[in-house]
Amino acid sequence: MASISSSAIATVNRTTSTQASLAAPFTGLKSNVAFPVTKKANNDFSSLPSNGGRVQCMKVWPPIGLKKYETLSYLPPLSDEALSKEIDYLIRNKWIPCLEFELEHGFVYREHHHSPGYYDGRYWTMWKLPMFGCTDSAQVMKEVGECKKEYPNAFIRVIGFDNIRQVQCISFIVAKPPGVL
């Protein structure tokens, strides 16, 4: 067996005591004496926040007959000119336009499970490839027209994809099947 010299033990003891003094010991939480607590019973309800008495003007979205689909679905159907302006906004922000369509459901639905998953209506079929290099809303509107012609009973949406951040930045429905509000 090897024996350890007394100078080696002294060195170990010295470093141990030095290391122990580097960190201050935990002394517990500070007392609450420095923070006085004043409880005031506030039974005066006249000082509550108010919306200025405009409650009768605020309406919620009616759930019957007017399904909310995506970003601009609370608006009346947009004209081709208004859709072109939205697409121009998308292009100005350097997002890549992409068209998708859905033949059955134009909204998120859960058919096979109650928790969200891949097959719950979020992912639609892509129409052709994303329009990299697109500089004009007329190009996108032409593709929307072709998609409508090919699938007249489909929901069609335009997506703006940011290829730098790798995220979808905007999505809105541009066409719905006839008879769907």
UniProtKB/Swiss-Prot annotation:
Residues 1-56 form a transit peptide. GO terms for molecular function: ribulose-bisphosphate carboxylase activity. SUPFAM superfamilies: RuBisCO, small subunit (SSF55239). One of its GO terms (biological process) is photorespiration. GO terms for cellular component: chloroplast. Keywords: Calvin cycle, Carbon dioxide fixation, Chloroplast, Photorespiration, Photosynthesis, Plastid, Transit peptide. It is found in: Plastid, Chloroplast. RuBisCO catalyzes two reactions: the carboxylation of D-ribulose 1,5-bisphosphate, the primary event in carbon dioxide fixation, as well as the oxidative fragmentation of the pentose substrate. Both reactions occur simultaneously and in competition at the same active site. Although the small subunit is not catalytic it is essential for maximal activity. Heterohexadecamer of 8 large and 8 small subunits. The basic functional RuBisCO is composed of a large chain homodimer in a 'head-to-tail' conformation. In form I RuBisCO this homodimer is arranged in a barrel-like tetramer with the small subunits forming a tetrameric 'cap' on each end of the 'barrel'. Belongs to the RuBisCO small chain family. This is Ribulose bisphosphate carboxylase small subunit, chloroplastic. It comes from Lactuca sativa.
